[in-house]
UniProtKB/Swiss-Prot annotation:
Written domain comment of the UniProt record: The N-terminal domain contains the HPr binding site, the central domain the pyrophosphate/phosphate carrier histidine, and the C-terminal domain the pyruvate binding site.
Protein species of origin: Geobacillus stearothermophilus (Bacillus stearothermophilus)
Main location: cytoplasm
SUPFAM superfamilies for this protein: Enzyme I of the PEP:sugar phosphotransferase system HPr-binding (sub)domain, Phosphoenolpyruvate/pyruvate domain, Phosphohistidine domain
Cellular component terms (Gene Ontology): cytoplasm
UniProt protein name: Phosphoenolpyruvate-protein phosphotransferase
Alphabetized GO MF terms: kinase activity; metal ion binding; phosphoenolpyruvate-protein phosphotransferase activity
Cofactors (names): Mg(2+)
Sites where the protein binds Mg(2+): E437, D461
Family stated for the protein in its record: Belongs to the PEP-utilizing enzyme family.
Residues annotated to bind phosphoenolpyruvate: R302, R338, N460, D461, R471
Function according to Swiss-Prot or TrEMBL: General (non sugar-specific) component of the phosphoenolpyruvate-dependent sugar phosphotransferase system (sugar PTS). This major carbohydrate active-transport system catalyzes the phosphorylation of incoming sugar substrates concomitantly with their translocation across the cell membrane. Enzyme I transfers the phosphoryl group from phosphoenolpyruvate (PEP) to the phosphoryl carrier protein (HPr).
GO biological process, one term: phosphoenolpyruvate-dependent sugar phosphotransferase system
Length: 578
């Protein structure tokens, strides 16, 4: 009875699939309270600060190397960015000035300055900038610990099977997790796009984040179930519930084993129609995971990771090597590269772009590239040079008008002609397309379809722009509705317009891998589904059981419904989805 009384379920956000059952290990946040003291020797205090920064750099360098070996280049880039923070005079100079002018101790000056920057970034109210706040918090916590002589928990020392419970996991915490012992984790804060969630998916560790209260409810040694499928954390489950979850875990593992058999199969519907399943990637390191999960191509190569976590623009040759590597690894399979989508909410400090009131509607992506043409042309040259090494397709992000697309394509053709004049080989017939993520582009799809080779629908932005709802703002997140009939009608309009001109349509937003969305998108005629690598095999298994002709019959009904709830209910009933 004792267990039954103490059993408790907490709800959070399913951040990484799977089920973990193990003893709880609380990753405690050390007391880093920085009391204010007056110092007599200002120079000695600045020297203390610099010594602590140097030690923090040593640790981060070691963690970066560990991440590089275990997780790949893109995850290691997080720590390269942290090292840049510790070299940033905009952070360090105000700390030193505070020590000098106020004659205060280094701990207090660091803490106060960090809090100022953290609150400034958090007030910007978009996920990317909030993650910059998390970077500063992680880095300054490490320096502060050295100043205070406090030891920070090291998850790499765990030597028994556990589920980690923490307020949050910093990137450096997550990079040190050993999969042999850490079976899952649950945190109070965070979302699906936070560093810890991304790392968990990379490590394939079940995770639930954003529970708000898990650290208040769980003690060391409690038996905890982390349900990364449904976003639940069960504390001290009853023997009956524990047995149910053991079965649920076994079913999930068996299902994964069945999915694994589909790795080398093409995606063919029950009535014999081929549908392309592709992967979204950020770096060349991601190709390995894409192929291991049976990707038939790369539907979105986000090139901005090449530009982030560094102090200057990548050179043409650096970019060429990255693009060539991806194309060669994909061995003739299509690779759709999105040109630089940066600016506004995704900052590159070295570009020194002005702060904007509304970065999502501001100077970003193709708008920035058409103005900063030297940077844009460098990327296009690198892509064109790499094109001979595989099946390259190029697409431009955030296109709102025909003029933008025409201008971007004209620049691409100018660079191609210049390379050919120089005797540099460029592939023939490179397809050039665009992202459809702005409602204006979706509405005008019939005109764009005459000039593009393909469309890729970016649902993440298309939904928030159409619904006028920031998906990272909890107060309006209920309006972020992928199944809203307005969104489905736009998607249908884009696909129909493209098909009338003989062009193909892909989708690279999260919606493409959603089990409820898949039958709808098949019904609407989507040609290519591009998703995170781990979603490919479940999607393939689902599509093999669906008949395209049968799915097509629901198109009219789905588009005639009035609410997202009605759409979901209808699709679940029709296709027997849970």
């Amino acid at each position: 009875m004792g267990n039954a009384i103490r059993e408790k379920t907490i709800h959070g956000i399913a951040a990484s699939s799977g089920i973990a059952i193990a003893k709880a290990y609380r990753l405690e946040t050390p007391d880093l309270a920085a009391e204010k003291r007056t110092v007599a020797d200002v120079e000695a205090e600045i020297a203390r600060l610099e010594a602590a920064v140097a030690k923090a750099k040593e640790e981060l360098e070691a963690i970066k190397q560990h991440a590089l070996e275990k997780l790949g280049e893109d995850k290691a880039a997080i720590f390269a960015a942290h090292l840049l923070v510790l070299d940033d005079p905009e952070l360090l100079n105000p700390i030193k000035e505070k020590i000098q002018t106020e004659r205060v101790n280094a701990e207090y000056a660091l803490d106060e300055t960090a809090l100022f920057f953290i609150s400034m970034f958090e007030a910007m109210d978009n996920e990317y900038m909030k993650e910059r706040a998390a970077d500063i918090r992680d880095v300054t916590k490490r320096v502060l610990a050295h100043l205070l002589g406090v030891t920070i928990s090291n998850p790499s020392l765990i030597s028994e099977e556990v589920v980690i419970i923490a307020e949050d996991l910093t990137p450096s915490d997550t990079a040190q997790l050993n999969r042999q012992y850490v079976k899952g984790f649950a945190t109070d804060i965070g979302g699906r796009t936070s560093h810890s969630a991304i790392m968990a998916r990379s490590l394939e560790i079940p995770a639930v984040v954003g529970t708000k209260t898990v650290t208040a409810e769980v003690k060391n040694g409690d038996i905890v179930i982390v349900d990364g499928l449904d976003g639940q954390v069960i504390i001290n489950p009853s023997p009956e519930l524990l047995a149910q979850y053991e079965q649920k875990r076994a079913r999930y593992e068996a299902q994964k084993a069945e999915w694994a058999k589909l790795v080398h199969e093409a995606t063919v519907t029950a009535d014999g129609i081929h549908v392309e399943l592709a992967a979204n990637i950020g770096t060349p390191d991601d190709v390995k995971g894409a192929l291991a999960n049976g990707a038939e191509g790369i539907g979105l190569y986000r090139t901005e990771f090449l530009y982030m976590g560094r102090s200057e623009l990548p050179t043409e040759d650096e970019q060429f090597v990255a693009y060539k590597t991806v194309l060669e690894q994909m061995n003739g399979k299509p690779v759709v590269v999105r040109t630089l989508d940066i600016g506004g909410d995704k900052e590159l400090p070295y570009l020194q772009l002005p702060k904007e009131m509304n970065p999502f509607l501001g100077f970003r992506a193709i708008r920035l590239c058409l103005e900063m043409q030297d940077m844009f042309r460098t990327q296009l040259r690198a892509l064109l040079r790499a094109s001979v090494y595989g099946n390259l397709k190029i697409m431009f992000p955030m296109i709102a008008t025909l003029d933008e697309f025409r201008q971007a394509k004209a620049i691409l053709l100018e660079e191609k002609e210049a390379l050919l004049r120089q005797g540099v080989a460029v592939a023939d017939g490179i397809e050039v397309g665009m992202m459809v993520e702005i409602p204006a582009a979706a509405v005008m799809a019939d005109q764009f379809a005459k000039e593009v080779d393909f469309f890729s629908i970016g649902t993440n932005d298309l939904i928030q722009y159409t619904m006028a709802a920031d998906r990272m703002n909890e107060r309006v997140a209920y309006l972020y509705q992928p199944y809203n009939p307005a969104i489905l009608r736009l998607i249908s309009h884009v696909i129909d317009a493209a098909h009338r001109e003989g062009k193909w349509v892909g989708m690279c937003g999260e919606m493409a891998g959603d089990p409820i969305a898949i039958p709808i998108l098949l019904a609407l005629g989507l040609d290519e589904f591009s998703m995170s690598a781990t979603s490919i095999l479940p999607a393939r298994a689902q599509l093999k059981k669906l008949a395209k002709e049968e799915a097509a019959r629901i198109k009219e009904t789905v588009l005639s419904l009035g609410t997202a709830e009605e759409v979901v209910s209808f699709v679940k009933r029709t296709f027997s989805l849970a």
